[in-house]
């Protein structure tokens, strides 16, 4: 039940987009493409292999945005001695994750970076 130019695997539809966007714009783009669309998430290594089989022939050695990030909420941070983190001196840049199309290693990148991306939705 996927759209004609999408690929199906284990009850989900996938599409690689060869257009560079930042993480938030790519996520919004996926949400507009199809009902319940999002940047790709992975349940197991076979799903990863499937995504690589789609992305590598089209993109070669590139990074693609995946749905993992701390974009929507802050992680819980505390000092090693247990003190609360009340004073913060880091930049406000959020971190998102991109996957290598060669071996799917996940790499933390600034969410403002622009990469290709893969969308996923239920079939």
Curated annotation (Swiss-Prot):
Keyword GTP-binding: no
SMART domains, alphabetized: CLECT
GO cellular component, one term: extracellular region
Keyword terms of this UniProt record: Disulfide bond, Hemostasis impairing toxin, Platelet aggregation inhibiting toxin, Secreted, Toxin
GO molecular function, one term: toxin activity
Transmembrane segments: none
Protein origin, superkingdom: Eukaryota
Disulfide bridges in this chain: 2-13, 30-119, 96-111
UniProt cross-references to PROSITE patterns, sorted A to Z: C_TYPE_LECTIN_1, C_TYPE_LECTIN_2
Localization, UniProt: Secreted
Function as written in the Swiss-Prot or TrEMBL entry: Echicetin itself inhibits aggregation of washed platelets induced by vWF, thrombin or alboaggregin-A. However, when complexed with the pentameric plasma immunoglobulin Mkappa (IgMkappa), echicetin binds specifically to GPIb and activates platelets. This is caused by P-selectin expression and activation of alpha-IIb/beta-3 as well as tyrosine phosphorylation of several signal transduction molecules, including p53/56(LYN), p64, p72(SYK), p70 to p90, and p120. In vivo, it induces thrombocytopenia when injected into mice, probably accounting of activation of platelets rather than inhibition.
Complex and partners: Heterodimer of subunits alpha and beta; disulfide-linked. Forms an active complex with the pentameric immunoglobuline Mkappa (IgMkappa).
UniProt similarity note: Belongs to the snaclec family.
Protein name: Snaclec echicetin subunit beta
Species this chain originates from: Echis carinatus sochureki
